[in-house]
Every structure is written in C-alpha cells, then in structure tokens.
Amino acid sequence: MAEISGNGGDARDGAVVVNLKEEDEQQQQQQAIHKPLKKQDSLLSISVPFLQKLMAEVLGTYFLIFAGCAAVAVNTQHDKAVTLPGIAIVWGLTVMVLVYSLGHISGAHFNPAVTIAFASCGRFPLKQVPAYVISQVIGSTLAAATLRLLFGLDQDVCSGKHDVFVGTLPSGSNLQSFVIEFIITFYLMFVISGVATDNRAIGELAGLAVGSTVLLNVIIAGPVSGASMNPGRSLGPAMVYSCYRGLWIYIVSPIVGAVSGAWVYNMVRYTDKPLREITKSGSFLKTVRNGSSR
C-alpha cells in the first residue's frame, strides 16, 4: 500500500508540475506579447506631450518674432509711423499675450537664453534644452522668412543701403552693444525668476511683469543694440538675410546675462530652504516642470 500510494502521489505530483510549467510558459508568452505594447505606450505617453511643447515653442517664437519685427519693418517703410515707443509696446504686449496663451503648455520660453538659464539652475531638464533651442530657432527663422516675403527681398540689407532688415545690428561699438545686451537680458531673467519660479510670487501676473520688462528694455536699448535679449530673435533673421555682422554679440551676451540673472536671483531671494532646494520651487512653470519629469 505504501508503494501504491507513493506511486500515485508521484504521478499526481508530476501532473501538478507539468501543469505549473504549462501555466508558466503561457504567462511568459503573454508577457512577451504585451511587453512591447506597454513599452510603446509609455514612449508615446512621453513623446506626445513633449512634441506638443516643442510645437508651442515653434508657434510662440514665430508669433513673437513676426509681430515684433513686423512693427520694425512697418516703422521703417512708412516714415517712422510706429515710433520707438510703439515698437516697444508691440514687443511687450506680444510677450504678455503669448505667456498667457502658451505658458501652461511649454513654459513660454521662446528664447534660447531663458531655456539655458533655467537648465543651469535645475529648473528645466538639461536633456530637453537642444530640442527647445532648435524649436525656437525654427520659429524665428520662419517668421523672418515670412517678413522678408512681405516687406521686400533686397539682397544687400546688411550694408545698410537698403531700409528693410528685421534683425539686430550694433549701432555703436561692439563692446557697447555687448554690455547693454548683457544688462537688459540680466534684468529680464531676474524678473522672470522672481515672478515665474518663486512660490511666494503671484504667478498669474508673470505675463504682465515679463511683458512690461521687455517693453522697457526695448525703449532703453533699441536705438543702441536693437534690444535683442534673445539669441533666436537675432539668429533667425541673420540666416534669412545672410547678415551675420555682430551676430556673436547677440548669442553670447544674452546667454551670459540670462544665466547670471537667474543665479543672482537665487542667491538674493530670502528663503528658509537650504541652497540645494532653492531650485525645486516654482509657481508659473510648476505644471510644466512636473509634466517634464513624468
């Protein structure tokens, strides 16, 4: 009896083992089938929102450069009808409107210097900087191309012989333009850091504050350097019009000024948090940053 019961037990145990192996194989096959689908879904869930942000940066930069530079072109072609204060108002209002329209989608950078400054402080993912910068340059280039089609196709605008050029050129010395671009971009980024990244600030007023800062900077620096504050704003028209004179000023100075402005604000702001946690706070860009981290 002991042998029979033992054999029966072995047979039953063997059957159980076989069934378990079959179930394991079926589960592995199902996991192998569904695993690529889950991976694909996760990639789509990450890439689609990011592509939306890039599209927002392209469109926002396009509208910003188109509106601001169109004011410059109209003012030039129509006997200074817009005037310098008018041009400044157009730039400021355009920035304000676009911040409120697209800020909740992409953060409303529209400026490689702002993107790089945020990344240097840890408020923006470093790996997303190249895509953002490329999107901003694309938007600026498309806007400049549109304006060239609308306001003339002169071939020698860089020499100053023709009156339509929507880019930026130093009116004085290179040093003068470099310094003033550094100062106004520092000022702009300092304000952005205060109203758009500090939990204690009123984030809803970020667009108004940033737009007003741009308006003031254009009035101050417009006649001297063109008040770029934005490497993309200068690079797009420069490529479209093949005019690269003094372009290095408008690439280097705004980036250095923006990074300096962001870090100086982080140092002077009053907070009970340790220094390592300062860059974790935010208000206006809080949603965007959280979305990027997911």
From Swiss-Prot:
Q: From its record, what is one biological process in GO terms?
A: arsenite transport
Which residue numbers does the motif NPA 2 cover?
230-232
Localization per record: Membrane
What membrane topology does the annotation report for this chain?
Multi-pass membrane protein
Q: Which positions carry Phosphoserine?
A: S283
User: PROSITE patterns from the xrefs?
Assistant: MIP
Going by the UniProt record, its keywords in alphabetical order are: Acetylation, Membrane, Phosphoprotein, Repeat, Transmembrane, Transmembrane helix, Transport
Entry's Gene Ontology molecular function annotations: arsenite transmembrane transporter activity; channel activity
Motif stretch (NPA 1)? 111-113
The protein's matches in InterPro entries, at most eight in alphabetical order, are given as: Aquaporin-like (IPR023271), Aquaporin_transptr (IPR034294), MIP (IPR000425), MIP_CS (IPR022357)
Give the domain note: Aquaporins contain two tandem repeats each containing three membrane-spanning domains and a pore-forming loop with the signature motif Asn-Pro-Ala/Gly (NPA).
Put simply, this protein is called Aquaporin NIP1-2
